[in-house]
Amino acid sequence: MLACIKGRMLDLFIRNAMRVLAAAAIAFAFCVPAAGSHLVTGNGFGFAVVAPENGVATKFYPHPYSFVRPDPAKPLSEGIEAANFIKTLGWGRAGQKSSAQYVDDSHVIRMRTGGSAGYFFMPFGFEEPALIINLEGAPRSGAAWKVEWNAPLRSQESVSAAGAQGRLLRFDGIDEPLLLIPLGTLRKVTGSDQLLASRSAWALISLQDESQAISVIRKFESWRAGLAPSALVAREIAELEQWRTQPTVHFRSDKERHLWRQSEVMLRIAQSREPNLADRHGNGLIVASLPDGVWFTPWVRDMAWATVALARMGHRAEARAALLAYFNAQPTGKMRSEVNGADYQISVVRYFGNGEEEPFFTMEGSTNIEFDDWGEATWALGEYLRLYNDRSILKAVTYRGPLYEAARNFIVKPLMANTEGYGGGRIVSADTSIWEEHQKDKKHFAFSTAMAIVAMREFVKIAEIEGDDAGRRDALANLALLEKGFAAAFIRKGELHGTLEEGIKNDIDGALIPIINFGIVRDPEVTRNTIERMSLLKVVSGGYRRVRSNYTDPAIFEYWYERQEFLFVDLALAELYRTLGRKSEAQAMLTRIVDKAAADHNIIPEMYVALPCKLFPGEIGDPTGALPMVGYGAGAFVLHLLEREHRGAGEQAALKPSATRTSRP
């Protein structure tokens, strides 16, 4: 009976989706948005990127991250890069006017070029790195797919199964074979070496090796269930609507609602669903940005914000998978010699796609140590437990044993092992912290100690859930020491400072705002003073940068990077304004971000241009940096709206999960 009800509901969703597609086609013809940012689709197994200004897809990655594993020949490099199959994939002529948009705030991309329209999407229901392309009305318009591969085609052969005949392609320099399965009717093509021109619709599926071809064709045909390409598009949108949770916030505008829905999808796209294997342990990891953003690598810190956003939205399964990813990623503890000999589980920076710790991020080929990561991972675990009371996760078997024991022994203990006595309490040892300073410039950052305080607050409750009285007492004692040390080290003469060390760069620091939002600082005069000094970080684009940069050499990346407007700081400050009752100012800051996103496919970028340059070109206020941004973009926006609801309607109504899912479809 339940299956029958679900089936009828899906049929209804599909019929509605077909109407949405029809309406979108009409609207698309009359209301074409500016080209804007590149659009990305993904399904947790890979990514594809569409460039509206060129009318083509420009990337198809067979993995949901940028770097697969370390490069043994270059241990301090960013690693072995994920393959990309295509250079261009489209149907129009060079110079033709093109545009693209997401259909109904989904991951399905509809593009119009030269009077024809087509779809690109990676289906969540088919658990392989697969890209579906469908060109509408191709026989009537004469439009046909054209592809330029990103590497020389080495060989191709026919392969058949389940009544479908595909082509298996191999490329020079790419390990993964590419399987092509035709979906549309056969077209007569003369004088063309373009294989894709023979059909209006295709499935492009990356394989681990060619031996998978037959089984993947059968799997695909089972998933397809005989549906026409247009029906596959409609079903994908309908299934996505079933996955969504009911928002627990009151939107102030349609723009807010659309940005919430698109952000929800961005968070889903960003999470790896690749199964763990003997040499791969990245299932559940979340990248910091989506391509073409340069940060489509799993960062501990950004992932924490994305995880908490998913949890608070009601996406329990995705949040749980992210937490398990923290504890199953391996090998970790690579920098043990740099952290007082303490073994640890959570990476000190980020991860390769295979789940291995990557502590190398400064772009100069040297290592970083970011202790705040350990605090943020513990915060995410505590938030999840508070929302769902899922005690079973603490018993889950992970890389280093039961999850609770791994958290206690390989997060809390190494964190406290990397603290120093100060002012009768303790502070976290010098590191590179939230803004990823170069290791040679490490300092005692307020943010790292603040996140250690958050970690101990959370672990007090986690230990209580587990029934570990000794662990709870230790966490309480550590908490008291850290709070005392923080007050002595970072609040000096009534002013909150970003570092223990004196210096103009971090004297006022955008990271101080989330510290106050976390409730680490409660003195209203200190808060008022901090807000007043934030004027020193105001930039001409209208928002705030992270720090006052002290770089003097324009040849250095950070010289330009640190002079741009940083949206994570904007959203944090707007939240603080709202807490203090400055609601109109808070809403104005939020509305500005929402309006800018609405003009750019509801994509939230890392930054806005405040100082145009070659690295960050454009007009003042244009989106720049990594985009779409995930944890610091979609996640931060979602959390801001949830916090606004909490301030206006009470915590229980705002944060209680609604319509949660218990499995990841």
Model-derived segments and spans:
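Terminal accessory carbohydrate-recognition/targeting modules of carbohydrate-active enzymes
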Residues: 2-5, 12-16, 20-259, 294-297, ...
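C-terminal capping/lid segments that line or modulate ligand- or cofactor-binding pockets
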Residues: 37-82, 295, 350-373, 377-378, ...
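Helix-terminus loop motifs that line ligand-binding clefts
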Residues: 100-103, 277-288, 314-426, 592-630
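Well-ordered alpha-helical scaffold segments within catalytic/enzyme domains
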Residues: 245-252, 265-269, 304-317, 365, ...
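Conserved oxyanion/phosphate-binding beta-strand-loop segments in alpha/beta enzyme cores
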Residues: 248-290
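Hydrophobic core segments within long, regular secondary-structure runs in both alpha-
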Residues: 257-268, 307, 316-327, 375-385, ...
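Extended ligand-binding clefts on enzyme/binding-domain cores
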Residues: 300, 331-359, 368, 443-454, ...
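Internal metal/ion-chelating core segments
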Residues: 417-465, 475
